[in-house]
């Protein structure tokens, strides 16, 4: 049996090896012209990996399936069961390498639908916590955060307009606005204020999110 040096490297302490970080987003969603279709997955992965590097917790990767409200039609999604089964796979294999606490960083609003199912996975020897970053779809916050992460095309901001791409702020998603008051309020805000890139805000938001999850990991130890 190899004697592993759990105290080596830049880590909070040896106990952090019992914590795993999972990124959750979506891979197949339109985000206007300036952001890629896998924006949510990339932002979640960027944040999760950086939190792992800073704390020493183990980055377990990104969940491939994603789910969505049936009335939000801006991409290709999967069932809640598909998402949960993938998370179960990561958790089961994480436990084989000594992880008993899991932090899921979710950057896709539709995935909040799995909340109740996630709670069912918790038991005495396995704790799972999901934190959500839910920004107005492809609007100012997400554009600015995308810039900070490095996935925004500034040249394509010229055509990043909800009058051209209906999913921006979900302004043109009529059914979603009719069935979800929160979506309608966000869409109204985009209609009134527009969408623009704020580089300073994007960098601030990214640092704030990373620091927030670093503290969550610290408290999970």
UniProtKB/Swiss-Prot annotation:
The answer on whether this UniProt entry bears the keyword Aminoacyl-tRNA synthetase reads no
Could you give a single Gene Ontology term from the biological process aspect? riboflavin biosynthetic process
The EC code for this enzyme is: 3.5.1.102
Cofactors required = Fe(2+); Zn(2+)
Among Pfam families, the record links this protein to: Creatininase (PF02633)
The entry marks the following residues as binding Fe cation 1, namely: 29, 40, 108
A single MF term (Gene Ontology): ferrous iron binding
InterPro entries (UniProt xref): Creatininase-like_sf (IPR024087), Creatininase/forma_Hydrolase (IPR003785), FAPy_deformylase (IPR024901)
The record's cofactor note says: Requires one Fe(2+) ion for activity. Requires an additional second metal ion that could be Fe(2+) or Zn(2+).
Q: Which domain of life is it from?
A: Archaea
- Tell me the residue numbers annotated for binding Fe cation 2: 31, 40
Entry keyword set: Hydrolase, Iron, Metal-binding, Zinc
Annotated membrane-spanning segments are: none
What is catalyzed by this enzyme?
A: 2-amino-5-formylamino-6-(5-phospho-D-ribosylamino)pyrimidin-4(3H)-one + H2O = 2,5-diamino-6-(1-D-ribosylamino)pyrimidin-4(3H)-one 5'-phosphate + formate + H(+)
- Pathways involved: Cofactor biosynthesis; coenzyme F420 biosynthesis; Cofactor biosynthesis; riboflavin biosynthesis
State what this protein does.
Answer: Catalyzes the hydrolysis of the formamide of 2-amino-5-formylamino-6-ribosylamino-4(3H)-pyrimidinone 5'-monophosphate (FAPy) to form 2,5-diamino-6-ribosylamino-4(3H)-pyrimidinone 5'-phosphate (APy).
* Family (UniProt): Belongs to the creatininase superfamily. FAPy deformylase family.
The subunit field of the Swiss-Prot or TrEMBL record says: Homodimer.
PANTHER family xrefs = 2-AMINO-5-FORMYLAMINO-6-RIBOSYLAMINOPYRIMIDIN-4(3H)-ONE 5'-MONOPHOSPHATE DEFORMYLASE (PTHR35005:SF1), 3-DEHYDRO-SCYLLO-INOSOSE HYDROLASE (PTHR35005)
Please identify the protein, giving its name as recorded: 2-amino-5-formylamino-6-ribosylaminopyrimidin-4(3H)-one 5'-monophosphate deformylase
The species is Methanococcus maripaludis (strain C7 / ATCC BAA-1331)
